[in-house]
């Protein structure tokens, strides 16, 4: 409870700071990222109506804030208070304690064989491996998978 209160307080303060900032700089070559906020064990921050976190996601989006919410339970992102997955620009999936069929289907827009393939890939992920949504080939009409499997040695 104390840790939750501290994170809640910090998120509220970040909201105050980011509301005052101008929009992030964007041009053809780059997008300015001012700050990363990483919340590990994020399920503790997603299981209640966390207005400061929802505001931070909304405000931070065009102010150069990148928020990483990490949890081993993907169901946490489908909170009854807020759909965090719908607001995720780059959802990354690492090894999970349990795999939610509905979240995989919603996130990747797959059914049947493609769904079973992604689910199997997630179940087989090893330390340092992740799956990222990547429908580039499909959008170009070239077929291909709706995801990429990546080996990560350093996140930041």
Which residues make up each language-model segment?
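Conserved P-loop NTPase motor module
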Residues: 5, 121-156
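Conserved P-loop NTPase motor cores
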Residues: 1-117
């Amino acid at each position: 409870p104390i840790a939750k209160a501290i994170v809640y307080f910090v998120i509220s303060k970040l909201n105050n700071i980011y509301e005052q900032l101008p929009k992030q700089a964007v041009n053809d070559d780059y997008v300015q990222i001012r700050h990363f906020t990483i919340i590990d064990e994020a399920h503790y921050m997603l299981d209640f109506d966390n207005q400061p976190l929802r505001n931070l996601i909304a405000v931070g989006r065009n102010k150069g804030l990148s928020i990483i919410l990490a949890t081993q339970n993907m169901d946490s992102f489908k909170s009854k208070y807020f759909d965090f997955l719908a607001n995720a620009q780059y959802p990354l999936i690492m090894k999970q304690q349990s795999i939610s069929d509905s979240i995989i289907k919603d996130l990747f827009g797959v059914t049947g064989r493609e769904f079973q393939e992604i689910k199997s890939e997630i179940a087989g992920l090893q330390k340092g491996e992740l799956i990222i949504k990547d429908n580039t080939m499909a959008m170009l009409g070239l077929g291909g998978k709706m995801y990429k499997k990546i080996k990560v040695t350093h996140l930041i």
